[in-house]
Amino acid sequence: GATSVEYIVSVADYVKEVLGQDIQDLKVAIVHEDGSYGTAVGEGNYAAAEEAGMDIVVYEAYSSSTLDLSSVIMKLIAAQPDVLLLTGYVNDGSLFVRQSAELGFTVPILITHSGGHSVQAFVDAVGDQVNYLLTVDPVPCNPKLDSFSEELQTVFQDFEARWTEKYGVKPAHHVEMRAFAQAYLFFTQVAPLAIEQSGTFSAASCRDAILSLDLDASQSLMGAGVKFSTPDEPFVDPVLGNSHVGQNIEAKAFINQYFDGELYCVWPEEYAQKEPVLFLPSSSSLSAGVVD
């Protein structure tokens, strides 16, 4: 949840140029589905926005099974936020887009958080309105390939070609990219190491191998290194302060954006395939019209 706020802070000068406001003057709305995923992201959004000094004007949870988000959207219309940080799944995510258009809700900056916003079903549901939506994901989608080793560039191109041939669409969403990247990492790094260390291939030997991994970002299609926290060295969340064991402390989140129905990495720069469009343009039904 913190990544979306970090991204906005990183482009503070551009925000000031367009909106005439410093980061501390931005009105931020945080809306999320009320399950464990949405709640965790929302808490991260809130903590990071609060730390950045932003004015949090809406902090609202809803059920992902809802058939009506009009009450939430009316609160947003009343609050007139500069930024909306939104987390949900496919059905509620597409419902939000549809009802926002019906009720006239617009916002200058909208950032979604993976989940249902980064899958083909969401694209199919909202059509062209998906374009220019920003989403925070655990992998860079359609990344700049020279960020990876030559070997991984070849592997990615082969994966993309085979997937596209079989399914008719590119693997341009976090689900496909993450599943392949993790499976490839397991079979090329974890499994061989487990057998080398113990002479066996088992759940226990794989666990030991995983905990001993220390890879840099160039060795993984995840766009991040691999080093897991242990009971002796737990990971402490820098935003929320929670202590975790078994977490990849090198993990990152990335900002992807839809262009012509496909997700492309736009931040951080070393993985960016396209330039980000921070403010929703007039072609979006959610655009507040601050840019053409």
Question: Which role does the model predict for each range below?
Answer:
Residues 1, 100-182, 269-271, 282-290:
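Extracellular/periplasmic periplasmic-binding protein-like sensory domains
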Residues 1-103, 147-150, 154:
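Extracellular/periplasmic Venus flytrap/periplasmic-binding protein
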Residues 6-9, 94, 177-188, 204, ...:
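A structural signal for well-ordered alpha-helical segments within the folded catalytic domains
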Residues 16-24, 123, 167, 194-198:
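Alpha-helix termini
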Residues 22-23, 77-79, 102-104, 125-129, ...:
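Extracellular/periplasmic catalytic domains that process cell-envelope and extracellular macromolecules
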Residues 24-30, 81, 140, 165-172, ...:
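Flexible glycine/proline-enriched surface loops and loop-helix/loop-strand junctions
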Residues 44-52, 99-103, 121-125, 162, ...:
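Alpha-helical structural signal in soluble globular domains
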Residues 163-176, 188-265:
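Segments of small-molecule ligand-sensing domains
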